[in-house]
Amino acid sequence: MSTRLLSVDDLTVQFGGLTALSHVSIEVHPGEVVGLIGPNGAGKTTLFNSICGLVPIASGTLTLNDVTVSWPKPHELVDLNISRTLQGVGLFPDLSVMENVKVGAQKYSKSSLLRSVFAFDKKDEKDLEERATKALERVYASSLGNQQADSLPYPVQKRIAIARALVSNPRLLLLDEPAGGLGHQDIEWMNSLIKNLKVETSILLVEHHMDVVMNVCDRIYVLNFGEVIAHGTPNEVRNLSLIHI
């Protein structure tokens, strides 16, 4: 069995006549945090969305938890032991924190989610409750389950969004700008949270805050113009003359 949770091999993505990603290869191994950085338009979000099955792949392969696919579908991520957060929070404001977290256990498309948020099998309800409780504990929000999501401060909502992604017990967690919109103190708190999460769950993150990337990542891939132009540890990347951090 492979030691890689994620392997992106020679991936190319095209939109019309534009090549958004060109022959990109990255890996994520158990027990590590891997960062994707680069300027706006470098291809970070496109790569992230390709892994999540949100954009079609022109060529190359993705191996997710030992399953090789040409183009994963978003609803298949749970079966592949992968989960993700969205930019911002994406919580349902009229639902409680606990209800929002439970939604993360659903295997859904956008339409099916809106039609039936809580179409859970009754026999699984106890297990779901336990997993949602554990997910909230992992983000230090176990006392907030009954509160309305939109009543919480934005930094706390970010934690709830991560808990929702954790409820399916993923081996690999994809974090889309976890520090986005946070102040300095909350960014430090997020750094600590990510380090604690990687004990049980490997992480691939896209992030513009370099203090987060340098603090929490074991390895970093630098993208520009749709290509990986550098790869290494935080110290190795920091010392590259082409990277101004």
Regions found by a protein language model. Give the residues of each.
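The feature captures the beta-strand-to-loop junction immediately N-terminal to the Walker
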Residues: 37-39
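Conserved ABC ATPase "signature" region
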Residues: 112-150, 192
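Catalytic Walker B motif of ABC-type/P-loop ATPase nucleotide-binding domains
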Residues: 173-177
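A short, surface-exposed alpha-helical micro-motif characterized by mixed small hydrophobic
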Residues: 213-215
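ABC ATPase "signature
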Residues: 231-232
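Conserved small/polar residues in nucleotide/adenosyl-binding loops
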Residues: 244-245
